[in-house]
């Protein structure tokens, strides 16, 4: 098997303590042929000086300052990595996530090299709080058939778990500039040009802390998802189920605070059990 390079894209902003953990999780990978693009939205917490230290000790780490704007959002960072990386594959990390499987890249690259008709591979994640205590964990649908069946019901991949073919990402035009769910739309478009798979193993920690989305943004997210689901209705099954789920989520955002808090878990249960 060849030893193709993986370009890892890691956007960051004022999270130096978590960023260090993310970078160290990359450096612990048994698969060594990688380059890491840390793309900084002009942090003010000492990120630049710490990154210079990392660049001095590991030439595979590259640091860029690239201010983002509301008009282009995080898509600007992600497309910068795709367009400027030299790897055959692209992997993703956010500055508050980290890989927990030291063989994550090795396993995913081996699968992709053996299966050239696949364009995207992910894995399971463990969701943690700011004290790194486990909140819950989940494995995504594994096979291409299973993924496609539920691709319009919920996002079939999580960013810190994925690896995809760079040429396929360029072929579909990279990430679209969307206010929300640009990753979900990107994964669905990748699925239009090849097969998808999820390793049935936990490969990453995903931080859930201080990320509560405002009610206004919940409603905007739901409205955005209507457009994404509709755009892919002819490429994936269960369009009306996905549409109905999103209607429920939009209506849920209009409930009084007490009912929203006490119905969220129930809604998640219904979604997983019946959809």
Regions found by a protein language model. Give the residues of each.
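Conserved nucleotide-sugar donor-binding catalytic segment
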Residues: 83, 123, 137-220, 224-225
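Glycine-rich, basic loop-to-helix element that forms the pyrophosphate-binding segment
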Residues: 67-85, 95, 107
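A conserved acidic beta->alpha catalytic loop
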Residues: 32, 40-50, 68, 94
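Conserved donor NDP-sugar-binding/catalytic core segment of glycosyltransferases
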Residues: 103-135
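The conserved acidic donor/metal-binding loop of glycosyltransferases
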Residues: 94-98, 124
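N-proximal low-complexity "stem/linker" segments adjacent to membrane-targeting elements
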Residues: 1-27
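Short aromatic/hydrophobic "clamp" motif used to bind/position activated sugar donors
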Residues: 90
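Short loop->beta transition adjacent to catalytic acidic/histidine clusters or analogous donor-positioning motifs
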Residues: 3-6, 27-38, 46, 58-62
């Amino acid at each position: 098997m060849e030893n193709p390079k993986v370009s890892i894209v890691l956007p960051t902003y004022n999270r130096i303590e978590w960023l260090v953990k993310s970078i160290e999780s990359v450096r612990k990978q048994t698969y060594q042929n990688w380059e890491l693009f840390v793309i900084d939205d002009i942090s003010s917490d000492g990120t630049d000086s710490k990154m210079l230290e990392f660049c001095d000790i590991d030439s595979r780490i590259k640091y860029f300052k690239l201010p983002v704007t509301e008009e282009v959002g995080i898509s600007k960072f992600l497309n910068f990595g795709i367009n400027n990386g030299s790897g055959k594959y692209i992997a993703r990390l956010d500055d508050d996530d980290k890989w927990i499987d030291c063989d994550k890249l090795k396993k995913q690259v081996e699968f992709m090299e053996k299966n050239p008709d696949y364009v995207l591979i992910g894995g399971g994640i463990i969701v943690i709080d700011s004290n790194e205590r486990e909140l819950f964990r989940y494995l995504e649908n594994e096979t291409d058939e299973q993924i496609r069946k539920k691709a319009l019901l919920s996002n079939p991949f999580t960013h810190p778990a994925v690896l995809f073919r760079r040429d396929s990402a360029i072929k579909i035009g990279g990430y679209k500039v969307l206010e929300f769910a640009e990753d979900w739309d990107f994964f669905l478009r990748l699925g239009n040009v090849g097969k998808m798979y999820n390793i049935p193993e936990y490969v990453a920690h995903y931080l859930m802390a201080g990320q509560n989305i405002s009610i206004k943004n919940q409603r905007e997210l739901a409205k955005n998802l209507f457009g994404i689901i509709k755009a892919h209705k002819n490429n994936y099954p269960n369009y009306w189920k996905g549409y109905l789920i999103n209607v429920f989520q939009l209506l849920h955002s209009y409930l009084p605070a007490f009912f929203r808090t006490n119905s969220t878990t129930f809604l998640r249960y219904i979604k997983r059990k019946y959809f």
